[in-house]
């Protein structure tokens, strides 16, 4: 095999079949080692053919090879392998008695670790992972079907193929001692695995009994019945190889893995993952360019993943450094009209995050951003889009101040008050937050208008001090504190500032008491809560 491995491409399946048959009959460890070495040699020269064969069945050779975890083994690596040199066999200590297996690629991975040095190991893993990634790309869920008349069993078998590729990547990466072989492939691995996660979120494992051959490869794994979890565990294995442990700890602490697996929170999980990867310095321009194309993908899941990724990325100046900010911002403006409400929500979040990542660009294109987010308030069929637009507008108006907001100030204020009594607590909280920002940002031009608006909204603000949702109640307190100067209610403003530890009921009682005192003739304060210029009135 050492002299002819390069010439036997056509015979690879036959050779592996012979090894498959003979391995259980081998009684001597030495002979098994020779067979494993033969498989390793074939894989070095014909990785595609070997991978195809390995994915077909649960290889008995896995029973005879121990696949250590990422931290197992303290021995120094062997001398580098180079083409033409004899491959060193695994030590006997690495081959325990027949026992459990961690997957079809375990034997191959351990053989590589034993016989592959710095050059051979990198060459092998690079080639091996590239073949797996290419196969996974070609099996993408958004690829058109070649035939609509496939038997159900064939369709379910085809659905298992990406999962087997994903599992293979996990096993190979987990068996490596050095991260170098994976680190330089990370910009290519990340989009492949993110795409697989997006394709499997909310899905179940194919259940056809005729698909058992493919399921053998996944059998015994913790995520047997959850294809998305399998993809997430593979991504975690890759990141564990490349990143410092503190970043993996942070992902777990923030609940990123659980969110990524949940169809209702997948977008938030992508934001958490992107934020950690940014801080770890693993977001690169090639990854950004790949995900840019996903924004217009036929798959809604891919568009959600891409929109959430860029919503978080908008917080950082990296897009400006790569000269990608303008096309991405333009794409997010367009995505506010996407058919997916989650995509629209993430687009609004991304535009709001321009405040942190590119405030000068926000000021330059403030008209388009304000108008787009104002239109988002009209998306009443999707409460999450409206809430995100309200919060984004709060950030944008705070940055621009009232003068730069222009005539849109009036439209935003009128639209915002319509959500004070919304059924969803997230809408009420976001509306109170934005209303307080509008009060703080109102310039002389808009003070008279805003005072008139408060004539119809102050009662609602007071009542929602006792909002059943704690977040909405706190946001209402902040808004009322900022609106109090427009009403001439100095005592109310002072009471809100001083009594910060009162319960909602106690605070409401205190504010009502202050209102009664303010309305009493001859007392400090106006005769009513709506002292617009040139107007009187009572509360």
Positions of PLM-derived features:
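Short coil turns that connect the paired helices of HEAT/ARM alpha-solenoid repeats
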Residues: 22-26, 60-64, 98-100, 138, ...
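Flexible loop/turn segments at the boundaries of HEAT repeats in alpha-solenoid HEAT proteins
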Residues: 2-12, 42-51, 66, 78-86, ...
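Alpha-solenoid helical repeat scaffolds
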Residues: 34, 53, 68-71, 107-111, ...
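HEAT-repeat alpha-solenoid elements in large eukaryotic scaffold proteins
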Residues: 1, 27-32, 66-74, 101-112, ...
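Hydrophobic residues within the alpha-helices of tandem HEAT/HEAT-like
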Residues: 1-2, 35-44, 72-80, 108-119, ...
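Acidic, Ser/Thr- and Gly/Pro-rich intrinsically disordered linkers and low-complexity segments
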Residues: 30, 132-160, 200-225, 251-257, ...
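Alpha-helical repeat/alpha-solenoid scaffolds of the HEAT/ARM/MIF4G superfamily
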Residues: 170-274, 288-290, 490-493
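HEAT/HEAT-like alpha-solenoid repeats
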Residues: 7-23, 48-64, 84-96, 128-136, ...
């Amino acid at each position: 095999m050492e002299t002819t491995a390069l010439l036997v491409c056509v015979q690879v399946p036959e050779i592996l079949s012979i090894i498959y048959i003979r391995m259980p009959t081998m009684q001597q460890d030495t002979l098994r080692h020779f067979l494993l070495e033969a498989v390793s040699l074939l894989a070095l020269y014909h990785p595609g053919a070997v991978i195809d064969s390995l994915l077909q069945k649960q290889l008995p050779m896995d029973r005879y090879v121990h696949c250590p975890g990422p931290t197992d083994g303290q021995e120094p690596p062997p001398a580098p392998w180079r083409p033409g040199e004899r491959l060193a066999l695994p030590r006997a200590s690495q081959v325990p008695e027949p026992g459990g297996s961690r997957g079809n690629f375990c034997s191959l991975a351990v053989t590589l670790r034993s016989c592959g040095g710095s050059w051979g190991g990198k060459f092998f893993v690079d080639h091996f992972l590239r073949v797996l990634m290419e196969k996974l790309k070609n099996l993408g869920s958004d690829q058109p079907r070649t035939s609509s008349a496939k038997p159900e069993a064939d369709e379910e078998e085809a659905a298992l193929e990406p999962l087997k590729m994903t599992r293979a990547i996990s096993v190979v990466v987990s068996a490596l001692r050095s991260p170098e072989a994976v680190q330089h492939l990370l910009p290519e691995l990340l989009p492949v695995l993110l795409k697989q996660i997006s394709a499997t979120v909310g899905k179940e494992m194919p259940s056809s009994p005729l698909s058992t051959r493919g399921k053998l490869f996944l059998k015994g794994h913790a995520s047997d019945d959850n294809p998305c979890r399998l993809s997430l565990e593979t991504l975690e294995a890759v990141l564990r190889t490349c990143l410092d442990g503190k970043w993996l700890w942070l992902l777990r602490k923030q609940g990123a893995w659980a969110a990524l697996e949940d169809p209702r929170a997948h977008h938030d999980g992508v934001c958490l993952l992107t934020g950690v990867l940014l801080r770890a310095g693993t977001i690169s321009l090639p990854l950004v360019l790949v995900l840019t194309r996903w924004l217009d993908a036929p798959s809604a899941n891919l568009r959600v993943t891409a929109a959430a990724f860029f919503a978080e990325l908008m917080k950082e100046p990296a897009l400006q450094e790569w000269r990608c900010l303008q096309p991405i911002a333009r794409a997010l403006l367009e995505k506010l009209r996407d058919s997916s409400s989650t995509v629209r929500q993430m687009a609004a979040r991304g535009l709001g995050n321009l405040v942190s990542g590119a405030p000068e660009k926000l000021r330059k294109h403030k008209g388009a951003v304000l108008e787009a987010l104002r239109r988002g308030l009209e998306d009443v069929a999707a409460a999450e889009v409206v809430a995100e637009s309200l919060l984004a507008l709060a950030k944008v108006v705070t940055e621009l101040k009232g003068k730069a907001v222009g005539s849109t100030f009036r439209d935003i204020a009128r639209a915002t008050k319509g959500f004070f009594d919304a059924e969803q607590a997230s809408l009420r909280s976001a509306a109170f937050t934005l209303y307080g920002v509008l009060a703080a940002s109102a310039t002389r031009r808009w003070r008279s208008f805003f005072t008139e608006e408060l004539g119809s909204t102050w009662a609602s603000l007071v009542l929602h001090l006792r909002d059943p949702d704690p977040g909405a109640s706190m946001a209402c307190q902040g808004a009322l504190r900022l609106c109090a100067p427009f009403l001439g209610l100095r005592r109310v403003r002072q009471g809100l500032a001083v009594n910060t530890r009162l319960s909602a009921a106690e605070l409401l009682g205190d504010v009502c008491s202050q209102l009664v005192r303010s309305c009493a003739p001859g007392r400090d304060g106006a005769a009513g809560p709506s002292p617009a210029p040139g107007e009187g009135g009572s509360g």
